[in-house]
């Protein structure tokens, strides 16, 4: 089996459902989110994939997704590493606000710039560029070497931390990554060559991204 890396964004959280900016706040999964995580695990299992190690963030929605996926695979006892380097982008002063309320407070154009520019952070928060600057060094130092040793790796994380990884793996430009949305609970399977280049990529579930 070529070097295997599977990415999965956490299932729908309570705050996704309420249309709130979440960031580093820590709501749990909804019933739908748990079901999305189960479906992710079942889709991975149907492909006959298993893992040697799983990485996740310091936030419970990703940890819960990771746990459910591994349970579906009968792999709840493998090594699990939690690290805040994989956390969601910190939305700063937007965290906990309804997206419509934020638009009312700061204006639709300004909120759109914060959400969809690469390097402009919201007040007290992170841009996508800043998120990538903590995600990618951790990936390259801690995770990629294990993949290249032949270990099969799962990463259960967040929309923006995973966008940072996909940007690097798929060699996307800043403009391309801004158009990229990663659906909840939809595994992305990568096979990498011995230098970390992508040999093959497969989306296991087609789900609309929010």
Swiss-Prot record:
Active site: 10 (tele-phosphohistidine intermediate), 88 (proton donor/acceptor)
Residues the record marks as site: Transition state stabilizer: 158
InterPro entries in UniProt: His_Pase_superF_clade-1 (IPR013078), His_PPase_superfam (IPR029033), PG/BPGM_mutase_AS (IPR001345), Phosphogly_mut1 (IPR005952)
GO molecular function terms attached to this record: phosphoglycerate mutase activity
Top EC class for this record: isomerase
Keywords: Gluconeogenesis, Glycolysis, Isomerase
Known catalytic reactions: (2R)-2-phosphoglycerate = (2R)-3-phosphoglycerate
Record's signal peptide: none
Pathway assigned in UniProt: Carbohydrate degradation; glycolysis; pyruvate from D-glyceraldehyde 3-phosphate: step 3/5
Pfam families to which the protein is assigned, alphabetical: His_Phos_1
GO annotation (BP), single: glycolytic process
Family note: Belongs to the phosphoglycerate mutase family. BPG-dependent PGAM subfamily.
Entry-linked PANTHER family: PHOSPHOGLYCERATE MUTASE
Subunit structure as annotated in this protein's UniProt entry: Homodimer.
Function: Catalyzes the interconversion of 2-phosphoglycerate and 3-phosphoglycerate.
Listed name of the protein: 2,3-bisphosphoglycerate-dependent phosphoglycerate mutase
Phylogenetic placement of the source organism: Bacteria, Pseudomonadati, Pseudomonadota, Alphaproteobacteria, Hyphomicrobiales
